[in-house]
């Protein structure tokens, strides 16, 4: 079977057929160069939808509503605000989220159950509902507004995060696109910051949920910036079927290509989030192979990527590789240190548990790159995994010390 997956250079959330979006400044965030803080994603036709949500016990109101509405056979729109998380706001916050959904549904001439919702920003503050309801009614939807959607969901992000791919499989073509936000409070667990994915492929609801979970497990669930899991983490996917392909519904060759394309989209967005970590200068990629199991590989990769000591060492270009081993050792994974090989880039600094005498000045110079790859081979089995993180700088402390002031 012939197939191809191509990344489109100027792709956006509205690249797949039938999707439109619009964004506006509603006065939720402080006025800045990015004067957008409210956006709607809309499909011309009903969509099969899937979602994954935060495991944090302190969940925001929009998470509960979206989780409930995803229980219906189809959905058609997502309303998103940035600048206010609508978390820790009690019954009033829940009522605000419901009102946002109702206003969006009325404006788009659909039922509230058709609308999903997400919020991001400061915890503990009420939404300015009069401004939001008025702004929802003013939003103009267009296929051309895809990049505005990615900008409107940003908070402390320094850049928007979006991607689109075109997939060709033996005579038919479809697109998958995505946008995400996140720079701080990034340490997902069976969830993600805020992520939105669209496709014009025809996909069964059960398979869409399965495929999204598979993609999240090797992308959003493998990044960390600061070890904090957000109260609002949500990942959504809408599939409207306008590509008119044979419906992807299970373990077929077509479905495998769909999964590969979705993995590419999710990993690209996840790496963009890690790269844009608050105050970060370097993306850190942790590759673990030769583990006794996949779970052990994931445990080690995430532990090393999230270690404050590893992150600060990378920031200071300090080749203190003992910190990497210490993080691996506390991960809960099983391994024998006398079998471990450790590489910083192409330089092997540890062979079968013994230091190799690699030149530390050369290693320090290499650590000043914008992308740092650290590889551990446990030489035990076939388990392998990759995680992403970023360096930890004084700027991260400054950003978060001043966040609400």
From Swiss-Prot:
The record marks 191-192 as: Cleavage. GO terms for biological process: L-arginine biosynthetic process; ornithine biosynthetic process. It is found in: Cytoplasm. It catalyses: N(2)-acetyl-L-ornithine + L-glutamate = N-acetyl-L-glutamate + L-ornithine; L-glutamate + acetyl-CoA = N-acetyl-L-glutamate + CoA + H(+). PANTHER family: ARGININE BIOSYNTHESIS BIFUNCTIONAL PROTEIN ARGJ, ARGININE BIOSYNTHESIS BIFUNCTIONAL PROTEIN ARGJ, MITOCHONDRIAL. One of its GO terms (cellular component) is cytoplasm. The keyword Heme does not apply. Heterotetramer of two alpha and two beta chains. This is Arginine biosynthesis bifunctional protein ArgJ. Its EC number is 2.3.1.35, 2.3.1.1. The active site is at 192 (nucleophile). Belongs to the ArgJ family. It holds the Pfam family ArgJ. Pathway: Amino-acid biosynthesis; L-arginine biosynthesis; L-ornithine and N-acetyl-L-glutamate from L-glutamate and N(2)-acetyl-L-ornithine (cyclic): step 1/1; Amino-acid biosynthesis; L-arginine biosynthesis; N(2)-acetyl-L-ornithine from L-glutamate: step 1/4. It is an enzyme of class 2 (transferase). One of its GO terms (molecular function) is L-glutamate N-acetyltransferase activity. Catalyzes two activities which are involved in the cyclic version of arginine biosynthesis: the synthesis of N-acetylglutamate from glutamate and acetyl-CoA as the acetyl donor, and of ornithine by transacetylation between N(2)-acetylornithine and glutamate. The gene is argJ. The record marks 120-121 as: Involved in the stabilization of negative charge on the oxyanion by the formation of the oxyanion hole. InterPro entries: Arg_biosynth_ArgJ, ArgJ-like_dom_sf, ArgJ_beta_C. Its main location: cytoplasm. Substrate binds at residues 155, 181, 192, 278, 400, 405. CDD domains: OAT. Keywords: Acyltransferase, Amino-acid biosynthesis, Arginine biosynthesis, Autocatalytic cleavage, Cytoplasm, Multifunctional enzyme, Transferase.
């Amino acid at each position: 079977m012939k197939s191809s997956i191509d990344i489109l250079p100027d792709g956006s959330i509205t690249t797949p057929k039938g999707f439109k979006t619009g964004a506006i400044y509603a006065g939720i965030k402080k006025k800045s160069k990015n004067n957008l803080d409210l956006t709607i994603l809309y499909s011309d036709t009903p969509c099969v939808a899937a979602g994954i949500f935060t495991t944090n016990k302190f969940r925001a109101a929009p998470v509960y509503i979206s989780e409930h509405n995803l229980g219906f056979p189809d959905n058609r729109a997502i309303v998103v605000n940035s600048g206010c998380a609508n978390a820790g706001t009690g019954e009033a916050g829940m009522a605000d989220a419901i009102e946002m959904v109702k206003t969006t549904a009325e404006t788009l001439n659909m039922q509230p159950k058709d609308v999903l919702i997400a919020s991001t920003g400061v915890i503990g503050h009420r939404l300015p509902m009069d401004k939001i309801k008025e702004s929802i009614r003013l939003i103009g939807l267009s296929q051309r507004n895809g990049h505005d959607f990615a900008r409107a969901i940003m908070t402390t992000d320094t850049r928007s995060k979006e991607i689109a791919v075109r997939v060709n499989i033996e005579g038919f073509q479809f697109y998958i696109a995505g946008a995400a936000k996140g720079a701080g409070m990034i340490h997902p667990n069976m969830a993600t910051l805020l992520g939105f994915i669209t496709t014009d492929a025809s996909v069964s609801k059960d398979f869409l949920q399965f495929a999204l979970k598979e993609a999240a497990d090797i992308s959003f669930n493998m990044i960390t910036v600061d070890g904090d899991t957000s109260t609002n983490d949500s990942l959504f996917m809408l599939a409207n079927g306008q590509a008119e392909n044979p419906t992807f519904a299970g373990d077929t060759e077509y479905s495998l290509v769909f999964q590969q394309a979705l993995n590419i989209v999710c990993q690209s967005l996840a790496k963009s989030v890690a790269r844009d970590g608050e105050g970060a200068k370097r993306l850190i990629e942790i590759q673990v192979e030769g583990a006794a199991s996949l779970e052990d590989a994931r445990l080690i990769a995430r532990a090393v990527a999230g270690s404050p000591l590893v992150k600060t060492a990378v920031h200071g270009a300090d080749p203190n590789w003992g910190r990497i081993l210490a993080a691996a050792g506390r991960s809960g994974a099983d391994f024998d240190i006398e079998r471990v090989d450790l590489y910083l880039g192409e330089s092997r600094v540890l062979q079968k548990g013994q230091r190799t005498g690699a030149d530390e000045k050369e290693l320090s110079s290499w650590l000043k790159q914008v992308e740092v790859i650290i590889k551990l081979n446990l030489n035990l089995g076939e388990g392998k995994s990759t995680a992403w993180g970023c360096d930890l700088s004084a700027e991260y402390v400054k950003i978060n010390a001043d966040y609400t002031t």
